[in-house]
């Protein structure tokens, strides 16, 4: 990983630490309302009017740097694999694989062996590295 990417990963880590938990308005009051974010649209809504005590609104400024957005903390791009044939499409220089949960133990062992042979990093191998 080059120094600029490493710096951007550190920036992302700091930004994620400062990011508030974006919660749905009044989700703590009603059991039927999930915490998942919904934009407040009421005409008199306190959260929409940006009252500090009512929680933060989702805004562009909370986002990660574009160069490292969506990347795994190891610096690799995450690729979901569900067959051995899909391994041939992976570029080990910037992509790492994650084996799908629907794969059985026997096929997973074959994929792990083939990935190790090709020098591809596996993110959910089940082994501590």
From Swiss-Prot:
Keyword tags: Ribonucleoprotein, Ribosomal protein
Cystines in this chain: none
UniProt GO MF annotations: structural constituent of ribosome
Entries under PROSITE patterns matching the protein: RIBOSOMAL_L32E
Superkingdom to which the source organism belongs: Archaea
Record-level GO cellular component terms: cytosolic large ribosomal subunit
Matching SUPFAM superfamilies: Ribosomal protein L32e (SSF52042)
GO biological process, one term: translation
Xref: Pfam families: Ribosomal_L32e (PF01655)
Family: Belongs to the eukaryotic ribosomal protein eL32 family.
Name assigned to this protein: Large ribosomal subunit protein eL32
Originating species: Methanosarcina acetivorans (strain ATCC 35395 / DSM 2834 / JCM 12185 / C2A)
Gene name of the encoded protein: rpl32e
